[in-house]
Each structure stands twice: as structure tokens, then as C-alpha cells.
């Protein structure tokens, strides 16, 4: 069976990538940690590209052999293929409609996968994005809203149906908030190889970090590890 990726890939790279991974979570909403250095100088937009992990670091986390498929300075948009707009935040990272009217100023995103030899077969994929806000308080406010949004979309079934392709259904799990990082996991229904995805989101200073990782044999917290490694670089700047 052709494995499908997060729905974010539908509109990117002229539909060169397969959409899918609608991640949704549950649990009790909890506020972001606002005890951090909110007066810290904001990370500049010019520094965003350097925050994304390089392929070597991402491959070390997943135990994979991925390469960068593309980079983007635009939000992704899965609103035309995802079954429930109110839970579009769970369709994948950096969704245009999810971040609309939240005050963000810039985004940098990147897709990595290992499908270069056969575009129909992917063992692993990662989408990572960093989104800048004018202030740390605005970034934390988005994180708090995301905790509530992911909770409202928890433990449910969602469908992604891109034009001309079979629909893909995802069974979603509960959400977890550990150390200021929000995470969830989901499994593709009917997958012959146990294809599943993880999501993670956190905020550091004025930056929101939004990550998705997919694979048949994902390490336990791959998406969280990617997000936290990005966050660590922001903290030390």
C-alpha cells in the first residue's frame, strides 16, 4: 500500500508529496510555561533558517536516511482535503488557517523524506517549521490556544481526501504536555505496515516550533526530540 504523509504536503511542492497525517490529541488543556524570559530580545527573522535541524541531526533522531525534499517560507494549507476544518491544526505543522490572525510575522519550513529512489515508498518523513511572533507572549499565547485546540480534537477519526486519490483515515490518540512541549500520535487506518505519525509543538522566546514525524518504526518520541533540539538552540541564543 502506498503510504501517505501529513496533509501539509498536499499544497506544497506542486503536490509532489503525498498528504495524510492528521494528528489529533486529547487530555486536559494546560497553559504554557510563562515563567521564561519574556523580556528576552526576540529571535530575528533572519535567524529562522538556522534554527531548523539539518538532515544529519534529524536522521540521528529517527535512525533514518532522509534528505531534504524542499524548504518553504510559506504556511502549508490542507483546508481543501482535511475532513474537519475546526481540527485543521491536527492536519500537520504550520497550517495557514490555524495561524491566521494570530500575529505571526514569518515562517520557515522544511520537508525531509527517504523516497528519492521510489516516490511511492517512504520509510520515514519529517516536516519541521519555526514560526516567528513579535514577542514571546504572543508565541506563548499561540501555544496555550494549541493545547486547547488539540484537546478538543482528541481521540477521534479524521479523513484526508486529496483530489484524484483514495481517502486516508487516521485514528488519533491523546495529547501529552511535558516540559512545555505538546505532543500526540496517530495511526493510519488499514495500513499494512503500521504507518503512524507523531506531532509536537512548543514555544521558546518569540518562536513557535511545529513538527511532524512519520514512519513504520518511529522511535518513541521522535517529533518531540526534533522540537526540543530546535528549542534548545533558541534558549541558548
Please tell me what each predicted stretch does.
Residues 73-77, 150-195:
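Short Gly/Thr-rich strand-loop-strand
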Residues 1-13:
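N-terminal export and membrane-targeting signals
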